[in-house]
């Protein structure tokens, strides 16, 4: 079953689904800066555009262009900055 999610006044939208028993979402992040909290560990893969990421506890922003991934621990969070719309795949680990 597909589940639509909308965050930050519609600036981040995703569709959730299950694949091989694991939850995943695919989505689009519009231009802006947003903070996400995590319950479970996640792997984010940028599939279009580029995102700058800063994980909780860090002062450093790291750029992730299309085709690259990063992981975030559960019960934590991260900031995302997009200078143009970008697409992503989120896998819950």
UniProtKB/Swiss-Prot annotation:
SUPFAM superfamilies with a match to the protein in the record: RmlC-like cupins (SSF51182)
Entry's family note: Belongs to the nucleoside phosphorylase PpnP family.
Gene Ontology terms for molecular function: guanosine phosphorylase activity; purine-nucleoside phosphorylase activity; thymidine phosphorylase activity; uridine phosphorylase activity
EC number(s) stated in the UniProt entry for this protein: 2.4.2.1, 2.4.2.2
Pfam families according to UniProt: Ppnp
Transferase as UniProt keyword: yes
Protein name per the record: Pyrimidine/purine nucleoside phosphorylase
UniProt superkingdom: Bacteria
GO annotations of cellular component type: cytosol
Catalytic activity: a purine D-ribonucleoside + phosphate = a purine nucleobase + alpha-D-ribose 1-phosphate; adenosine + phosphate = alpha-D-ribose 1-phosphate + adenine; cytidine + phosphate = cytosine + alpha-D-ribose 1-phosphate; guanosine + phosphate = alpha-D-ribose 1-phosphate + guanine
InterPro entries from the UniProt entry: Ppnp, RmlC-like_jellyroll, RmlC_Cupin_sf
Encoding gene per record: ppnP
HAMAP family: Nucleos_phosphorylase_PpnP
């Amino acid at each position: 079953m597909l589940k639509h999610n909308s965050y930050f006044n519609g600036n981040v939208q995703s569709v959730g689904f299950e694949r091989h028993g694991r939850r995943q979402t695919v989505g689009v992040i519009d231009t802006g800066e947003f903070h996400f909290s995590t319950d479970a560990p996640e792997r984010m893969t940028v599939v279009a555009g580029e995102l700058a990421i800063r994980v909780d506890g860090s002062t450093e922003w790291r750029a992730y262009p299309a085709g690259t991934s990063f992981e975030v621990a559960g019960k934590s969070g991260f900031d995302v900055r997009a200078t143009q719309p970008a697409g992503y795949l989120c896998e819950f680990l």
